[in-house]
Regions:
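Gly/Pro-enriched, hydrophobic low-complexity segments
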Residues: 139-207
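N-terminal leader/targeting segments and the immediate start of mature chains
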Residues: 2-5, 9-70, 228, 238, ...
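Short, surface-exposed coil-to-beta transition loops
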Residues: 56-60, 80-83, 154-159, 182-184, ...
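Long, intrinsically disordered low-complexity tandem-repeat regions enriched in serine/threonine/proline
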Residues: 222-258
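Beta-strand-dense domains in secreted/periplasmic systems and polymorphic toxin scaffolds
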Residues: 73, 172-174, 360
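Short, solvent-exposed recognition patches
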Residues: 74, 223, 251-354
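Flexible, processing/modification-adjacent segments and terminal tails
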Residues: 90-153, 157
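An acidic-aromatic
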Residues: 62-118, 180-186
Length: 384
């Protein structure tokens, strides 16, 4: 009788422990769901790491969200300071490249067409929709393993989401089938009560802020140069010499400042392509058949033609800083690659990196194959 009683107690203990585990998982997800769904707006900061072959690209990330599908994602490559902004508002989706004062605009389901490691809503959807998710309690909180959805990159199969003891997302890692990290997002700040103005989701606001910042930097540089010139002249020259020197020095300083401003404008564009950049990946039975460099109005265009079983063209061309902000209507969807944000459609992949605009074009290859070629172009060209 005692043995039977002991056995029943053990069975009940197993059920209680099992039940507590399920309750713990459901309570964590319930709390996370409530937090995210109740947030009318939020602001996020963090770092994003993307692995490409043997290289790791790191971005500083800032995300702003406001209800009714307003998103602004600011991505800054920490290696070359290349900045791109993904913006969604009632007018559409934009990929903004401030360095060249240019935007691509297109109609897209982004960010709902695949997993997003830095957006809370899509992350929550991935958790809720995966009936086979795995939940685990950790010393610092909990870990949830769910399937990842990246239609254009079959290599990315699952994502590990780490939460702290207050059920705040701290880290998201996207893994391949060998459990090797390919994308990592570390959250340093999540403000679910952030009061965001509607204006920050307007393209004009982004453009105006960037231009105002550049103008302020130019004025500060000019003021400092004039101040330094006058101070040095006053110390080393007498009063009479100073009067003449000030005139000449100020003139020289103004000319120097103008030259520096002109050089600043030059740095925003690349006039020629010094090195030919070849893809590290070429489909089977495909070869380079022609290479042609042509001049255009403000730079050069390089056309590489590949023939064979899987023909395609790779076009590389210099980009020019636009004096008036240029909006280019585009068909396709956006894809965050290792070093930049690309525009992908059925026949091409297009992106800007290091003041060079790239196109991979083919009517024979799939989107996935086009992106494989694009991702293999990871060597930055030398420009002059």
């Amino acid at each position: 009788m005692k043995k039977k009683l002991l056995f029943l107690i053990m069975i009940m203990g197993v059920f209680i422990i099992s039940g507590c585990g399920k309750t713990s998982e459901s309570s964590v997800i319930k709390d996370l769901t409530k937090k995210i769904n109740n947030a009318k707006s939020y602001y996020i900061e963090g770092t994003l790491e993307i692995v490409n072959n043997e290289d790791v690209y790191t971005y500083d990330v800032k995300v702003s969200y406001k209800e009714k599908d307003n998103y602004k994602v600011d991505l800054v490559n920490t290696t070359n300071n290349h900045e791109q902004i993904i913006l969604r508002n009632k007018e559409g989706v934009y990929v903004v490249t401030p360095r060249i004062n240019k935007s691509f605009k297109f109609q897209s389901d982004w960010p709902y067409n695949n997993s997003q490691v830095y957006l809370l809503g899509p992350l929550l959807e991935d958790i809720i929709n995966d009936e086979n998710r795995r939940f685990e309690k950790t010393d610092s909180g909990s870990k949830i393993l769910v399937a990842a959805s990246y239609p254009n990159n079959s290599k990315l199969v699952k994502q590990e989401i780490l939460l702290d003891k207050n059920n705040n997302i701290k880290k998201v890692t996207v893994l391949d089938s060998n459990n090797v990290a390919q994308i990592t997002m570390n959250f340093t700040k999540i403000d679910l009560g952030s009061k965001l103005k509607d204006s920050i989701f307007e393209l004009k606001e982004i453009i105006d802020v960037k231009e105002e910042r550049e103008n302020t930097e130019k004025k500060d540089n000019t003021t400092n140069e004039n101040k330094n010139t006058n101070e040095n002249t006053n110390v080393n020259e007498n009063k009479n010499t100073n009067e003449n020197t000030n005139v000449n020095e100020n003139k020289s300083t103004n000319e120097s400042t103008k030259d520096k401003e002109d050089k600043t404008e030059e740095t925003k564009q690349t006039s020629s392509i010094e090195d030919v950049i070849y893809p590290m990946y070429i489909p089977a039975n495909t070869y380079l058949s022609n290479k042609e460099k042509v001049s255009k109005e403000s730079g050069e265009r390089l056309i590489l033609t590949f023939d064979g079983d899987n023909p395609f063209m790779l076009i590389e061309e210099t980009v020019t800083y636009e004096k008036e902000h240029l909006i280019v209507p585009t068909y396709g969807e956006l894809e965050v690659m290792a070093s930049t944000v690309a525009i992908v459609n059925d026949n091409s992949v297009n992106w800007i990196d290091n003041n060079i605009e790239y196109y991979v074009v083919s009517d024979k290859l799939s989107k996935s194959e086009l992106l494989d070629i694009a991702r293999s172009i990871s060597v930055l060209p030398v420009s002059k």
